[in-house]
Design a protein with these regions (language model features):
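Ampiphathic alpha-helical segments that act as solvent-exposed interaction surfaces
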Residues: 94-130
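N-terminal interaction modules that seed assembly of large macromolecular complexes
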Residues: 4-9, 13-68
Length: 183
């Protein structure tokens, strides 16, 4: 006998899909409700060396802190990590859900677009994507951020784009391993 997931989870999946469609610059988004964090990943079509990664991370940190200072807020979590291979660098920005907003997401997209230009990987819209109303897409993005911030969310999820499709998966919760008995 199987049980159905609550409607809220289906709504969250739909909203995360809307977020990824609205912001094609996002390579992926991952929620961590137990840590109350969200991780945004951007892909850059160039290999950034350690010095460039550090400068990039420092600039993102400065932009976010300045943005939040306008609202007299401080980030509880603000981490920037980079993973690179020969041709790509993935930049992961981890933020606390309490101070994260759609406006901050727009800031990240503008920052990456300005800094990376054509090197920023932008996922194309699906072939069946109709020209949507920008106001409706913005509203859906706002609801998506609010859904991620919802304290009743208990499941982690990851959403990403692959070959003009948006995929969203719920992640299994990781149980802590029991310590072995001492003899």
């Amino acid at each position: 006998m199987s049980t159905r997931a609550p409607v809220e989870n289906a709504d969250t999946v739909s909203l995360v899909c809307a977020l990824l469609v609205r912001f094609p610059e996002l390579a992926s988004i991952r929620s961590g409700p137990s840590e109350r964090t969200v991780r945004l990943t951007f892909a850059v079509r160039q290999r950034l060396d350690r010095a460039a990664q550090a400068a990039f991370a420092e600039a993102i940190d400065e932009h976010v802190r300045s943005f939040l200072a306008l609202a007299k807020e401080e980030p509880a979590v603000l981490r920037v990590d980079c993973e690179g291979d020969r041709a790509l660098t993935f930049v992961h920005v981890t933020r606390d859900l309490e101070t994260f907003s759609k406006e901050e997401l727009e800031l990240h997209v503008a920052f990456f677009t300005d800094r990376c230009g054509e090197a920023l990987v932008r996922n194309p819209h699906p072939d069946d994507h109709l020209e949507a109303d920008p106001a409706a897409e913005d509203e859906a993005a706002q609801y998506a951020v609010e859904a991620l911030r919802d304290p009743t969310q208990s499941k982690s999820l990851v959403g990403f784009r692959e070959e003009k499709r948006v995929l969203v998966y719920f992640l299994k919760s990781q149980k802590k391993a029991k310590a072995s008995a001492r003899r």
